[in-house]
Amino acid sequence: MVERRCYDKVNDKVLLISGMQWGDEGKGKLVTHLSKDFDLVARYNGGHNSGHEMYLDGVKYKLHSLPCGVLVPNTLNVLGNGVVVHLESLLSEIDGLLKLGIDLTNRLFISERAHLVLDLHIAIDSQLESEQGEYSTTIGTTKRGIGPTNSTKCKRTGIQLGELLNWDNFEKLLTKLTYKLNHENKVFSNSDLADLLNKELEIYKTNFSKIAHCVCDTSYMIQKYIKEGKKVFFEGANGALLDLALGTYPYVTSSNTTTSGVYNGLGISPSVKILKVGVLKAYQTRIGQGPFPTELFDDNYVKLQKHGSEVGVTTGRTRRCGWLDLVSAKYVQGFSGFDVINLTKLDVLSQFDEVKLCTNYKHKVTGTTLKNLLPPFRYLHNTIYREFLEEGRYPNCCYQFDEYEPVYKTMPGWKTDISDFKTFEQLPQNAQNYVLFIEEYLGVFIHWVCLFINNITFRWELAKMLIK
């Protein structure tokens, strides 16, 4: 029996929401919905490469760099030190919200330790993604310069936002980094590079004053809020399977997208008590290249893509779609430790006579499922290794995805429009069974069921109700 751990509006002071797949799980809907109960919403990773699409009071909003809490009046919003900032894009996003009547004056704070995304970073990213031939390193990024920015960060040559508070020093740092990056990547001629540098210096000189008042020690700010017992919300970008260390490497993003990334990304102590919420879409999607064991290429793909409106907010690319992969979800749960789950877009599956869930992988040749903990072993270059992965294990290397295929559990569909249903108990029994099977497989209580069209069904321990 799965423990029914529920979100307590009174006692759960610190909340974290993070994606359990390759991003695009629908995190923004729950963040926006719950943010009204919180004093501060902080984002701990990513940059303007991610995208959130939300509806609030009938108006559609598209966010990239900013936390979803910006849509909630009086809520403070933080971009932590784990976020990378492209100044022009951020200002454009702020101006766009202002035109829609949302003023972020005195509501947005940005870490002085956040690294800057330069236009040259974006040019390098675009160059890498356009490479052709045998030695191409293309992985399907958004071409927003996030990878090159984090690369310079790791090389200790990047520039933090706080450096702009001392213009003379910033000018030296930007000049040095620009010529160094171009020397390494050979993107521009010397004359074009000089023009780019002058243009970028002018942009920063003109625009930084617009957000200078927002730049501060956000780590101290968040720590202070937590100590004072205020309600703080942590928002992650992307999804756990895109994590640099634990995702489907190298087809990953360049930051830590897992729950553990919140500590470094915001500068808070691991001792802080956090209710961790995992967001899981009722089926699987992915943008860009990389392994996707349950990917569909038939009419079922067309149905999922069309009815789920699976188009990337940032790039406009059509998302790849497939059945829900519970093996990957269990893998993510193992290192994330989510207390509760928010299941999204359940209504998109209403069109199917039957639905499938991947519960295991089997070898394409031998047909053996991934559950062998004992021999047979085999040798490779005098090294012994297991021929089969044990049950519940997710492959570590991309080549392993080519050797295995999904094992599905088929469940009857519900063929009923559930978009207007207001309680979990109103859902067709087959839909309820689908939710309960996921819950039992993962061993985590599904506290919210989000419908793509309208509602969020909220499951209490004894009663099930809808939050409007």
Curated annotation (Swiss-Prot):
Major location (coarse): cytoplasm
Catalytic residues (UniProt): 24, 52
Superkingdom field: Eukaryota
One function term, GO molecular function aspect: GTP binding
GO BP, sorted A to Z: 'de novo' AMP biosynthetic process; IMP metabolic process
Note: Parasitic protozoa lack the de novo purine biosynthesis pathway and rely exclusively on the salvage pathway for their purine nucleotide requirements.
Role this protein plays: Plays an important role in the salvage pathway for purine nucleotide biosynthesis. Catalyzes the first committed step in the biosynthesis of AMP from IMP.
Binding partners and assembly: Homodimer.
Family stated for the protein in its record: Belongs to the adenylosuccinate synthetase family.
Protein name: Adenylosuccinate synthetase
Natural source organism: Theileria annulata
Organism placement in taxonomy: Eukaryota, Sar, Alveolata, Apicomplexa, Aconoidasida
